[in-house]
Amino acid sequence: MCVPAKQGTLHAKSPLPGLKIAGLLLRPRAANASSVDPRVIIYLERLLALKKVDASDVLSSAFQYSKDRLPKTGDDGSSKDSGWHNPPELEEVVFHRLSKAFQAEERPVNSTEGLRTLVVVTRWMQTMVTSHTSDTMIQAMAGIQQQPQQQSINVREGLGMLVVGVIENQKMLNILNKHHIKNCKSPGRSRKSNTTFTTNLATGEWRSERRSRTETQDLKSLRSNFEAVDWIFPTINTRAGLYIFLNSLIDSQNMATDLITAAFDILANAMYRSEPSQNMFCLKSFLINKIPILLLQISSSMFPMTAELSITQALSHVDPNAFPAFSQGFDDMLGNTNSLADVRQDFLNACALHGLITTATVERLLGETPMQGPPGTKYDKSTLLEQCKSNFDKISMYIDELDNLDGNAGAIVGAIAEFIPHLCETQMTMYLKQLSSLLFKKPQAIDVILQFTSPASILRPLCQILDDWHYDSDQGEYQPVYDEFGAVLVLVMTFMYRYDLTYHDIGIGAESFVARLMTKGNQSMLPDEMTDEQSKHLGHWLKGLYDAGNEGLSNDVFASCSPREFYFIVPTLFKQTVMALSAGILTFESVKGGLEYLMETFLLPSLIGGLIWMSSYALIQSHSDLDAIMRIFREVISSAPSSGDAQAMHSTILSIVSSRLEKCLRTIQRRDASRANSIEPLIQAIKGNLHSERSMFASMKELEQWTNAPNSTLHTSLRHTVQQLSQWASTSSIQPNPPSYTHRQVYVSLKIMGASKVIKAIVDELKAQTEASNGAAALDVGVSIICAPTVDDSPVPVAWLSSPIPASNPPRTRLNLREMLKHEFDNAAALVATDPLAAETVVRLHRRVEAQLSSIAENALQGHGSVLNLPNVNMGDMQSQSIPDDITKAIDDAAAASIADDITTMDNKALQRSMDDLTGPDGLDLSSIGMGTGDAGTGDMGAELGNLPDLDLGDMSGMGMDMDMDMAMGGGGDDDWGLDFDNM
């Protein structure tokens, strides 16, 4: 039967409070009911959706008829209402439905609902603990060892999930953080109820299966089990954790000693891994040039410690075999470019340069007389910048000094980062050409530059000037424009390809010249895809390059086509050349003559797009142009340009394209063994240019090392790495040298296996280490891997301190490890029955990860108004979790708050009375509204639910109902109670 049409009008005239509606709906219809009427759930969901009742109404009414609720004061427990309870299945469903609503932040709708819900949930926690504990004690004293019923466990789990949803809800935090909340009843000061509740929850949920297999125990043993649940891993910061963090991205840390030690550990690890000399130089530069500056920045916060004390402690932790005394390692230095014998001396000299220690201290810490002292002059960025502006030749000298590991690199980089925008603003293109040539010839210098400033600070001004580059109205010669434009372009491409950057990384628009060149500059075009102007330009270039009867590349060819237009037709130019040579339209001598033009500095940058296009086209097996491609490869790769500047640019370009060339040549070599003799010289020719990339991608050698061992996969290899780091973290005092580690292993695992399987590998190893009594160190290692900054989808912002132009935030591409762990945490309940230890590990790991990153999330909230990510609650570990004092105070103040933003029609005293009633010792009594249990025939409100007409829920939208603040609630005990956020 449907509700009459006038029903909505009736409710509009005489609305029922939400509490009364919820009480009517949830009132038991029979004593000791054992099943749930499914209509109750449907009606509840619809009433909640229509906002006729709220979460506190539902919870208050459900609590009134819960078995957990204690009798009212003075009740002997034998009243006629004692058997009138709802089945626990109904409570479980209510908890789970409301927890989802709070997790999705659909609730609370207003401040009143939030405050009252918090009060109800808190009281329910206390009474549930009292009820379950008393049952356990009675059973224990009677000698009965009865396991908790599964349904009882489910109810506790449901309430626990609701608690998590409430305390993680951003709206709840905002409500409780109101500054004008005053004169409250202090419901959050007692820690007992929350602590005991979480202990009971952990006992029932996480340990139920394990306990069910144990033998009967006495009361003392049962108490020991309860205490064991409260044990958690201590929060420790291990040497391995910072070692992982710095391996992923060199950045500053709070603890000076650990920072220095970790930097030495990484350098030792690189030596043991036989890293290339360029990698070793980069790590040495970070230790010697960057670390002293970071120490200087944080030295003011180290009181009463001193930088000298931190340095002394750190040097006592480093591996003496990796960093021998200078006199002991002198012989090794003569034949080993990777020797680290001079590193300690250079580091201490750099610290002395920055005033962290005295010159006399260097000798004391070394234990011998140093071979040389610190530099005589400490550079200042502003002074260097003024010198470069007044005398351009100075910049060449300072760029050369970036090779010196003396501590002055930071000032030099700062001057360069401001000098480049100055040249761009003043349109000094000739100086830009010279500066670009100086930089792209020294890739090591570029590595040092990016230790102090962001790629955007160097590249964004250069990209802007490439966009704005134009011919002057009185331009006479156009070839010099190509020369200057090309040098700047090669520097930009060196950065882009060496560090695998995208236009998002440097903060330029998709329509920028460099952005379009990176996405389309390697693709040839079909005739019908080209504009008339592009076709015209292509014809002029083909004729100028290959027409033997012509005078060559005239000034008109350059004048008619700007450099930007030229580089977009380069792949098509190479395609036409290859096809014409293959078809016999062009002779090789003609092609060779044209390539000689392309080997000059003003056109040499075109080889980037041309060689990348040929490397891709050569792998296509549906054409017969391979012979022509190989002849052009030999000419371009093996023939060095004549001038020194052209040779340096040619070598830089080969470094940019070498990885693609090698892959192409080796693929052709495998396909056609007859070409092996002609291909091998080309591979040898580019061998010195290989491995110039500084990207997250692992080499084939590393990948084979991780997967080729018997029974080894990326999963087992990653577990083995976590195991080694965990064991080293706990024994680093007696085993100073770090295990082999590179964060590229995590990157390649993410790319191949995905974030879910990487998390599984970490969790599996944490379980194993926990069982081996090494769980605390392993947990720190796992947290460090998950929290480490990454190139893509970083869990934390990667800020470039002191950079004049901060790095932009690239777009997200996939879930990172932190987000995948959150997904696993959300589904941890499903693991409890099958793998309780895995569930514990996931929850503990997630809580620790969020706790470590919470300060960053809080800063982001203050700066950008984003959602606050509070540490998620581990039900077994809540006692150790720390929440800021201001939030605790807000919760203490919330019970009697006057929230003017939401409650505009109620005065504050009414809300205060309501909250006082909620916390009263006599509990919630609904009999005054005709809802006494066991008296279904009394009053209009006592009708059996089964006798209700079939409600048309679609017709309930007209039921206007106001909030009723006269709300009382029952509970056990008269002590202060509530959520203890201080000790969670």
From Swiss-Prot:
A GO cellular component annotation in the UniProt record: mediator complex
A single BP term in Gene Ontology: regulation of transcription by RNA polymerase II
InterPro entries: Mediator_Med5_fun
Location within or outside the cell: Nucleus
GO function terms (MF aspect): transcription coregulator activity
Keywords in alphabetical order: Activator, Nucleus, Transcription, Transcription regulation
Homology family: Belongs to the Mediator complex subunit 5 family.
Function field: Component of the Mediator complex, a coactivator involved in the regulated transcription of nearly all RNA polymerase II-dependent genes. Mediator functions as a bridge to convey information from gene-specific regulatory proteins to the basal RNA polymerase II transcription machinery. Mediator is recruited to promoters by direct interactions with regulatory proteins and serves as a scaffold for the assembly of a functional preinitiation complex with RNA polymerase II and the general transcription factors.
Subunit and interaction comment: Component of the Mediator complex.
Name of protein: Mediator of RNA polymerase II transcription subunit 5
Species: Phaeosphaeria nodorum (strain SN15 / ATCC MYA-4574 / FGSC 10173) (Glume blotch fungus)
Gene name as annotated: NUT1
